[in-house]
Amino acid sequence: MSEAGHNLHALFPDHGPALHALKLGSSNFRQLAEEHHDLQSRIQRVEAGLAAVADDQLEDLKKRRLFTLDEIAALIAIEEEA
């Protein structure tokens, strides 16, 4: 499993079967998971002092990360209702 998949399993520990099904069957989910992973990596680099961005840019990255998590959570809910 990719690092992005491991990260999502840590964030949504009670939804493993839905995450697995979405990973296999939803290109939209895979795109969101990859975007979340990329955003998380960028934020971590900035917070560790390895990359520099303006404060407003960091806030935008964090907002985008939350948006992707909301979208992922919505897909999980739909998958679990099916």
Where are these regions (language model features)?
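Extended, charge-rich alpha-helical interface modules
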Residues: 1-82
